[in-house]
């Protein structure tokens, strides 16, 4: 399992920016009625904008994904959905099935299930991001959520059809020190799951040596930029505007 150990202060500036985005919407006030609905929409809009900036400036800007730019250019090719409930705590039990999901399944997993089913049944979007700005701030908790999402793909019999890529503000490879710039290849403004179609991935980048070399090339790129530059790039995407 990836190491969730964190040193105080390393990612505080990213956390501060996320807090500004969330508090600026008024969501924390738990206002009733139209005010709460407006706050939730504001949160969703801010998170979607920050996520898109991250794709444009970091993922595409640093060349981390060979076909991300083309996806951005095509209408309806990318879906960015935001889970704004903050209810990320329960799990899917081993006895669950696709037709009989757990009654206590949390909102984020329900949203992930819905997105996965839509991608299995419809040609659009080509790829999708589920962003969870509240409830998965702890990296180890996020890894548990990722495992539950993988389990759901199995329950839905979508293993081999869809695959997941994982991104988190505090992402850390288990073999890397916390200040290794390589960690930024999988760091994002908010915790998120990237849902990809396996057929699309193979068509775009293949399954041979080029595909296998992408992670190593990304690590080399991040390390050549350095920790401070990578942190600044990520921070600029999550600043409240």
Predicted regions and their residues:
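Expand to "…catalyze enediolate/carbanion chemistry for C-C bond making/breaking, isomerization
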Residues: 2-5, 12-13, 17-19, 24-241
């Amino acid at each position: 399992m990836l190491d969730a150990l964190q040193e105080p202060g390393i990612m505080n500036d990213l956390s501060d920016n996320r807090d500004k985005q969330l508090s600026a919407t008024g969501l924390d006030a738990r206002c009733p009625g139209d005010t709460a609905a407006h706050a939730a929409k504001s949160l969703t809009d801010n998170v979607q904008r920050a996520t898109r900036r991250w794709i444009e400036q970091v993922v595409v800007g640093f060349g981390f994904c060979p076909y991300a730019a083309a996806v951005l250019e095509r209408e309806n090719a990318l879906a960015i959905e935001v889970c704004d409930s903050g209810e990320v705590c329960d799990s899917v039990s081993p006895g669950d099935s696709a037709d009989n999901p757990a009654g206590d399944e949390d909102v984020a997993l329900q949203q992930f299930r819905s997105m996965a089913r839509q991608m299995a049944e419809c040609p659009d979007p080509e790829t999708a991001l589920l962003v969870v700005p509240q409830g998965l701030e702890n990296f180890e908790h996020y890894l548990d959520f990722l495992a539950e999402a993988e389990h759901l793909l199995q329950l839905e019999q979508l293993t081999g059809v869809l695959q997941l890529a994982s991104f988190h503000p505090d992402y850390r490879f288990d073999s890397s020190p916390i200040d290794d710039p390589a960690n930024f290849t999988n760091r994002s403004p908010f915790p998120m799951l990237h849902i990809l179609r396996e057929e699309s991935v193979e068509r775009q980048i293949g399954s041979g040596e080029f595909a296998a070399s992408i992670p190593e090339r990304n690590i080399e790129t991040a390390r050549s930029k350095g920790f401070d530059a990578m942190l600044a790039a990520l921070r600029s995407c999550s600043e409240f505007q």
